[in-house]
């Protein structure tokens, strides 16, 4: 019996609307929440007097819009402006960048009832709908993310949009900013992601004139006390506890509350002008903390003061922070020309709608599996139908292969990917899934001596891994596959193979097993210094006691145990 392939894909979900799954045993009349449903429709509607969909792609943004061109261009302008404004407090390299453009599907509020009616009609045809008497509520805005790309569905309020002439508040909402920070590799420290997100929540629009609201601290009452008495007692953590990679289990809710508030205060203090060059110092410190353990020496090299002095400075700044707004940096000038839009081709429409349908399928499977036939049928019609009509756009072929994997057709997925080098090149996720399929087959029938993988089997897998590397963001699964191959070969990894594994361990130090294996291979190869660096970072990041114990045991053996 063949073993299942290791799946790389993991859809990350975010929505402005509360995504309310139906609990097991829910009573009748429970509200069913389903993702936006995009049908394969005709390309024009006479009463609109225009093609339904327009398309544009520039830089790292792709647009498929059912909105009029002026609204679409206003959205794009707002999106670009917000990204530049955000860069004044958070550098662009701290945000997620993906190999593929971020795709936005824009839909006008005025046409939403038509889309919802399509979904309702399909839902009511299902036996489960009539039996359960469920009420349907389609979602509005939704973000779905694969390791190599993001798709966002945005409903534009036609009337409000023309009134405000400003970018959508959804685009860089605090939750979206948190996602962009936390999904970046190597991972930024938790205190930075938490503090920057909470600080961003205090932004006042337009922020270049109004800046940021005063620090909310622990509560309005706690802030009021400090406003009236700057010397009033306040809970404050030592900075060595603030800069840990993650809060340990067992901490009280009050401790977490103080930790979150102090992380925000630290970001605000660094950007307040109280520290000369504070913004650059903060960025330098956060970047360093993403790739090495945080020590007081590291902090001092960035801020020019030790932990005690910085803690005192933070505490002294707090009474001012809770009553005084923080001035925002000057907004950058924007002279980016409008994106070139054109009537979307059938290939573009089917590719983007089909990929959207593939992504929402995983959510529907988890929360409302009875609705899977609606989405799988529509997605198959969009992707397979377009393929059958001769469309060989590499991204569409890659999406079709991933859809086949998602619907338990691994043989069909592999057939597509093996036959289409262009599809493998178009999406890192697709070529990694092929690596996973080859690995599963090789482990099921190893052709090397002593039930080990042969060099030929390993080469076929690792060439797919190599094709995915060097693109943003790095995908953890690529290094996990490479490590699995190394474990099942009848030899030690070569220097170049170890370098690739070490790269993965440095990028994903939270993966204690990857760190452990890479450090062990380094030790056996005599690369003691590299093993030491990996173990130090692994111990800094490890939260699981057994994982820490394995790393400590490795540290105690061989050259590390006697040569430090």
Report residues per predicted region.
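Bacterial N-terminal signal peptides
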Residues: 9-18
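Residue at a conserved register position within TPR or TPR-like alpha-solenoid repeats
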Residues: 200, 404, 438, 445, ...
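Beta/coil-rich, acidic/histidine-enriched accessory regions frequently appended to metallopeptidases
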Residues: 28-29, 34, 291-446, 460, ...
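Canonical positions in the second alpha-helix
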Residues: 385-386, 419-420, 467-468, 503-504, ...
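Juxtacatalytic substrate-recognition/specificity segment
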Residues: 27-43, 47-193, 204-207, 244-245, ...
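Bacterial N-terminal signal peptides that target proteins for export
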Residues: 1-10
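Acidic/His/Gly-enriched intrinsically disordered linker/tail segments
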Residues: 49, 129-156, 167, 184-341
